[in-house]
Amino acid sequence: MDHLHSSTAELNLLWGSLILEELTRHGVMHLCMAPGSRSTPLTLAAAAQDKLTRHLHFDERGLGFLALGLAKASQAPVAIITTSGTAVANLYPAIVEASLTHVPLIILSGDRPWELIGCGANQAIEQLGIFGGYARQLNLPTPDLRIGPEVLLSALDEQLANLDRPLHINCMYPEPLYPSEHRFDQFDSYLSRLGQWQDTQVPYLSVANASLSAFPPRDAMMRFVHGKGVIVAGTLTEAETPTELITLSQKLGWPLLTDAQSQLRQHPGAIGHIDQLLLNPRARALLDQAERVLVFGGRLLSKRLISYLAEKDWHSYWQVLPHQERLDPSHSNKQLWLGRAGDVCALEWPRSSEANWAASLISLNQSVEQDFIHHIDGGEFGEAQVIRAIAASHTAEQQLFIGNSLPVRLYDMFAPIGCCAASTYTNRGASGIDGLIATACGVARHSGRPTTLILGDLSALHDLNSLALARDCQSPLVIVVLNNDGGNIFNLLPVPTEELRSDFYRLSHGLEFGYGAAMFGLPYDRAEDMEAFIDAYQAALEHPGASVIEVTVAQDQASNQIRRMAEWIRSR
């Protein structure tokens, strides 16, 4: 009986080791782990696996977002190990975000064997399909010598090949879970069925790279560029070489309108202030002359830009996406092309017959920037002023993660022009305020580049225990908390009464973050004016680790400034 138990534990461990080895052969570099007993075969295998960088955290929700950040920054799949029960369910928000933005996360969940599900066994829930349509599913049986290792590996390979969204691999392990020794000598005959696999570094089942692309033919491009057009840059990653859009804009002679998530929002060759320019009568009249639009990416932030695209009767509407999906809530009649933005830009585009038709947009864009310099940079201390200062100081070697709700909208509206911008990250698939600290930690950990996270106070409270992840960062990670004491984005929405806004939407809390930073041993500073913020920010960028800067502002400062700037630009 003891030998049987030992064999069970060792076979569990062998399967766990085979799984992790195969993941490394599919490009997995990072493994995020939470403690638990039912995932012991995977945990022990991970401890012995020297090809993976291991990241440990006590909270599975934060762990999932850490993996998301690592995958975003590395442009490679990241694996997550959890035990059974609600530990798996806590990954759900991160998996939703990853699915909507095509980030490959691989969940390895330990589970009870099937005979212990639905019978009152401890920490046992129905884990199969727990992520619904947000993840592909592979349900592994309990380890069994009658199931050859080649069956296990080929099943893994079929799911892992060409992975562009989350994959849930559910691993059922019977007890005992802890082997007396970590040797696989007794399985030599079993493993011999793998042949040369043990002496190579490639997957057991090699699947061809499935690259789905559909580019416009030359004659279609000739017809498309014949007229007045605009180019719109939506959400783009650095891997899509978004700077090629600048070259295309210059070649066609069409203006490039940029979103906060395009990596081009601050580029001097683009019309970055499009959200505010659409308020200006002269700019809007000029833009209304456009007949054709070429959109790269989707998930636009600016409601004004979204409305502009939706309301016009376009002669031709083209959209370029790296994946086949619908990214247009207005459901416009259009032609969808598939491919990387940079690859489509590199095609032999002819020059437009109406090149430079909207050249005056450049001077209008610069005029808006001068307004921002005068009214925001030279005005009262506030959230937009801080965001502009951060964005203006960044270099191409740095990274900027912008939190949801008000911060990302302030960046989209007011970011400065003419700067060498940092690599920009957001979580705008589901646009939640959860997991932002953890995701930024993942981005910072992979690259080791100086990283700034800008987020609101409610977002920071939502993910406060992820400061434990920040504590382990070895490169500068500056967490800037814009504390306006509640959800003040609701100041911009038509809530019927101020009493309702205060009691049911804004949720003032009266908290400050110094004690939270102290709890996790992080350097902390508080800024109530621009001079104090600049001093604190420069010091934080020189600190070899994470630090917290709290910016305290009045509840209505940002919303009032947004309204004042809108009135000013309308009247110009």
Curated annotation (Swiss-Prot):
The answer to whether keyword Ribosomal protein applies is: no
- Reactions performed catalytically: isochorismate + 2-oxoglutarate + H(+) = 5-enolpyruvoyl-6-hydroxy-2-succinyl-cyclohex-3-ene-1-carboxylate + CO2
As to how many cofactors bind and how, the note says:
Binds 1 thiamine pyrophosphate per subunit.
Which GO terms fall under biological process for this protein?
Answer: menaquinone biosynthetic process
Q: What GO molecular function annotation could you give as one example from this UniProt entry?
A: thiamine pyrophosphate binding
Q: In which pathway does it act?
A: Quinol/quinone metabolism; 1,4-dihydroxy-2-naphthoate biosynthesis; 1,4-dihydroxy-2-naphthoate from chorismate: step 2/7; Quinol/quinone metabolism; menaquinone biosynthesis
Query: Could you list the residue ranges that cross the membrane?
Result: none
Q: What class of enzyme is it?
A: transferase
Its Enzyme Commission number(s) read: 2.2.1.9
InterPro entries (alphabetical): MenaQ_synth_MenD, MenD_middle, THDP-binding, Thiamin_PyroP_enz_TPP-bd_dom, TPP_enzyme_TPP-bd
> Which cofactors are reported in the record for this sequence?
Mg(2+); Mn(2+); thiamine diphosphate
Q: Which UniProt keywords apply?
A: Magnesium, Manganese, Menaquinone biosynthesis, Metal-binding, Thiamine pyrophosphate, Transferase
The UniProt entry, under Pfam families, shows: TPP_enzyme_C (PF02775), TPP_enzyme_M_2 (PF16582), TPP_enzyme_N (PF02776)
What's the stated role of this polypeptide? Catalyzes the thiamine diphosphate-dependent decarboxylation of 2-oxoglutarate and the subsequent addition of the resulting succinic semialdehyde-thiamine pyrophosphate anion to isochorismate to yield 2-succinyl-5-enolpyruvyl-6-hydroxy-3-cyclohexene-1-carboxylate (SEPHCHC).
Protein family according to the UniProt entry? Belongs to the TPP enzyme family. MenD subfamily.
Q: Which HAMAP family match?
A: MenD
Share what the entry says about its subunit structure, partners included: Homodimer.
The protein's name is: 2-succinyl-5-enolpyruvyl-6-hydroxy-3-cyclohexene-1-carboxylate synthase
Instruction: Please tell me the species this chain comes from.
Output: Shewanella amazonensis (strain ATCC BAA-1098 / SB2B)
Taxonomically, what lineage is the organism?
Answer: Bacteria, Pseudomonadati, Pseudomonadota, Gammaproteobacteria, Alteromonadales
